[in-house]
Amino acid sequence: MNPIRKIIHIDMDCFYAAIEMRDFPELANKPIAVGGDAKRRGVIATCNYAARQFGIRSAMPTAHALKLCRELILRPVRMDVYQKESQYIRSLLTEYTDLIEPLSLDEAYLDVTESTQCQGSATWIAEEIRARIYQARQLTASAGIAPNKSLAKIASDWHKPNGQMVIRPEDVSAFVLDLPVRKLFGVGPKMEEKLRALNIKTCADLQRYSIEYLLQKFGTMGQRLYELARGIDNRPVNPERIRKSISVEETYPKDLPNSEACLAVLPDLMARLEARIQRAGKISGIHNLFVKLKFNDFQQTTIERVMDKLDLIVLRQLIQEGFARRGMPVRLLGIGIKLKQENTYQSVQLPLLDL
């Protein structure tokens, strides 16, 4: 019988913005954001909690963020500094386990099931990691401790910033009952809307549906929903995980009727993709650009082109070519990059959003 797993999700609080406030103390308690220049149609990579009170969020166009908060202080992205801090944190984590799965520069999963540190207590390990990060770098982290990755990630967000939460194995069944379905991995606004149409608001509501029904209604996502609603997630912490692509997509409440409508939503997708690339930090270089279209008959097509950088003109061309394959209304549109699978890493030059 396999032992009950002890999974920790470490998530740095407003990582880029926190570094800026640490390095420039005069910014403390002021609304700040890290991101691109509004004059160059940049996007927000992250912001501090003071800025979030104004409704500012990651991937938001900088110009819009400045409209929400005229006092917003905009800081340029200092990726080399953020990467250095991330490397220190990663080296600290390796003192507790070799089973570390980084998700980005500012968050990672740890499997400490076999760790003997802190008397084998995952709770104490998380507390010690957070304390050591703050002592050495004056940066706060939040942590979630649970029997699996999904619950650990949910828990790390529960007492942000600078807090942690434990979900014990014996408490999982009770914990998930009142959990809003929007907290589940893979449930975005569109999926939440579909679930609400079925009067599904919590995991308890979701548990009333059979796996057969959920598979019929949502395809492979139905199986995921069935398991997550019961606190089940058997995914291992994968230290060998290699990011192969970065992408964003959107399912639209009303189908996009033609290629012009698809091109009209491209700026929003591009802004979100840029923010996701910035969050990923150094990547192995771009190999391909691609677009994905799912038509209103649920048929899907993907078209890609070899490119070593983001190119808005090429993405426009790919959307037009992809749409021409069927010429039908589009219900889902996605764009992304495929990465070079090499050991050398580089920063990506992001283009201007100029359509």
From Swiss-Prot:
Top enzyme class, one word, equals transferase
Keywords, A to Z, come to:
Cytoplasm, DNA damage, DNA repair, DNA replication, DNA-binding, DNA-directed DNA polymerase, Magnesium, Metal-binding, Mutator protein, Nucleotidyltransferase, Transferase
Write down how the cofactor binds this protein: Binds 2 magnesium ions per subunit.
Is-annotated flag, keyword Nucleotidyltransferase?
yes
Any one of the GO BP annotations: SOS response
Cellular component GO terms held in the UniProt record:
cytosol
Reactions this protein catalyses: DNA(n) + a 2'-deoxyribonucleoside 5'-triphosphate = DNA(n+1) + diphosphate
Family annotation (Gene3D superfamilies): 3.30.70.270, 3.40.1170.60, 5' to 3' exonuclease, C-terminal subdomain (1.10.150.20), DNA polymerase, Y-family, little finger domain (3.30.1490.100)
List localization entries. Answer: Cytoplasm
Q: Supply the name of the protein.
A: DNA polymerase IV
Lineage runs: Bacteria, Pseudomonadati, Pseudomonadota, Gammaproteobacteria, Legionellales
